[in-house]
């Protein structure tokens, strides 16, 4: 009597491996995009924490704190404001004449996700009716990595 052979054939195993490869090819780019968006949100969160200090300094002195090299008006030096993926946040006078002050977050060139390494996110402040309006933008990040409020 012949023994019954059980198990998977080579073709079945190859089909399973091909399906796993296709699923991985779809999932990996989606995960990388998600990771970059999460890291961009760290920059936005760090800048959100500085909004009131930047606005208070401007309302009290009519000067935008520039923390390029030193602590300025109670805002830490640029290189001291960082995160896991954010190298620094620079507060300064706005480069766009429609705004008063701005904060520029620069991503690390090593730890950040590849699509955002060394790139920047800008948060600009404008005085409107005695209050502040903030605008988020980036000249070098793809829209897919920016929060909805920053997409233009």
From Swiss-Prot:
Keyword Hydrolase among UniProt keywords: no
Positions of the propeptide segment: 1-7
Coiled-coil intervals, chain numbering: none
Topology relative to the membrane: Single-pass membrane protein
This protein's UniProt keywords: Disulfide bond, Fimbrium, Membrane, Methylation, Transmembrane, Transmembrane helix
Transmembrane feature ranges: 8-28
GO terms, biological process: cell adhesion
An annotated GO cellular component: membrane
Disulfide bond residue pairs: 136-150
Pfam families, sorted: N_methyl (PF07963), Pilin (PF00114)
Modified residues (N-methylphenylalanine): 8
Intracellular or extracellular location(s): Fimbrium; Membrane
InterPro entries: N_methyl_site (IPR012902), Pilin (IPR001082), Pilin-like (IPR045584), T4P/T2SS_Core (IPR050470)
Highest taxon in the source lineage: Bacteria
SUPFAM superfamilies: Pili subunits
Record carries keyword Ubl conjugation: no
UniProt main location, coarse: other
Annotated NCBIfam families: IV_pilin_GFxxxE (TIGR02532)
Family: Belongs to the N-Me-Phe pilin family.
Protein name: Fimbrial protein EcpD
Species of origin: Eikenella corrodens
Classification lineage: Bacteria, Pseudomonadati, Pseudomonadota, Betaproteobacteria, Neisseriales
């Amino acid at each position: 009597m012949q023994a019954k052979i059980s198990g998977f054939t080579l073709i079945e195993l190859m089909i399973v491996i091909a399906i796993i490869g296709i699923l991985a090819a779809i999932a990996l780019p989606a995960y990388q995009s998600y990771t970059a968006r999460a890291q961009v949100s760290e920059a936005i969160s760090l800048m959100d924490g500085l909004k009131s200090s930047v606005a208070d300094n401007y309302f009290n002195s009519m000067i935008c704190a520039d923390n390029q090299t030193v602590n300025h008006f109670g805002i830490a030096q640029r290189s001291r404001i960082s995160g896991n993926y954010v190298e620094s946040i620079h507060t300064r006078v706005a480069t766009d004449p429609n705004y008063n002050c701005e904060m520029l977050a620069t991503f690390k060139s090593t730890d950040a996700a590849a699509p955002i390494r060394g790139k920047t996110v800008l948060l600009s402040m404008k005085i409107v009716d005695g209050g502040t309006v903030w605008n988020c933008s980036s000249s070098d990040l793809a829209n897919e990595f920016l929060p909805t409020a920053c997409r233009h």
